[in-house]
Each structure stands twice: as structure tokens, then as C-alpha cells.
Amino acid sequence: MWLYIPMIIILIIADQGLKFWISVNIKLGTSQVILPNVLALTNVRNDGAAWSVLSGQQWFFTVITIVALGLMGYFFWKLRSDNLYMLAISLLIAGTLGNFIDRIRLGYVVDMFETLFMNFPIFNVADMCLTFGVIIVIIALIKDEKDE
């Protein structure tokens, strides 16, 4: 269990560090192409959730985040002997805290990864942690279902 705590901390530092770098080095609303026709770093502010849903509802995000972190903390402890769930929950905690830090500190979330080959919302490291965390939870649930 204790191996996952440093992972959470490292992911949060990576998320916050990249967000800081983007904010300092790329002008708001502009992009720097990393891989032509594939990926750009774009400095955008998102005061909503994915696809800017619930834009400007910071109180709502604060309450939901605190409740979610409480639940994740409970499952982090309860499922501490299951490495697959621990990996998933650790990613979910890192992603949740990464974006929560932005919301509390800035009032918005800094997003930066823009896919150039398809129309997809701009996202950040915390969003990737959340996405992979959910995918791993689904895999763990399917695995548990097969084991029964």
C-alpha cells in the first residue's frame, strides 16, 4: 500500500509542474506544435469539467471533490491488498487532487494537451490519471466478475 503514496505524489508534482511550465512559457490561448498533425501544447483555462460542462460551478466541484476523495480514501484503505484496485485508486486520487489544486488555487484548471488528428477536448496529466484510473477499475471489476 505504501508504494502507491509516492506514486500519487509524483503524479501530482508532474501534473502541477507541467501546468506551471505551460502557464509561464505558452501564452494563454496559443499553441506550440510538438508532433505535426498529432499533438500540440495549448494553454487553456477550463472552469468546468470535461468539455467545459458545468462551467463556473466551483462550489459544486469543491463539494463533489471532497466527497469523492473521502470515498477514494475509504477504498484505498479497504482494498489495500489488491494491487490492481490500488493502482486504479491511486491514479484516481492523483488526478482528482491535481485538478482540485488548480480549482482552489486558480479558480480554473489548466489544460494543455491538444490532439490535432481528431476533435477532442484539450486535457492535462490529471485528466489522463483519471481516465486510466477508471479504465483499470473497469478491468478489475471484469476480472472480479470472472473470478466468481
Swiss-Prot record:
Underlying gene: lspA
Domain of life the protein comes from: Bacteria
Record protein name field: Lipoprotein signal peptidase
Membrane topology according to the record: Multi-pass membrane protein
EC number(s) from the headed UniProt entry: 3.4.23.36
Class of enzymatic activity (EC top level): hydrolase
Residues the record marks as active site: 111, 127
Protein family (similarity comment): Belongs to the peptidase A8 family.
Location (main, coarse): membrane
Metabolic or biological pathway, per its Swiss-Prot or TrEMBL entry: Protein modification; lipoprotein biosynthesis (signal peptide cleavage)
Pfam families tied to this protein: Peptidase_A8
Transmembrane segments: 2-22, 59-79, 81-101, 122-142
PANTHER family to which the protein is assigned, alphabetical: LIPOPROTEIN SIGNAL PEPTIDASE
An example Gene Ontology biological process: proteolysis
Function: This protein specifically catalyzes the removal of signal peptides from prolipoproteins.
Protein location: Cell membrane
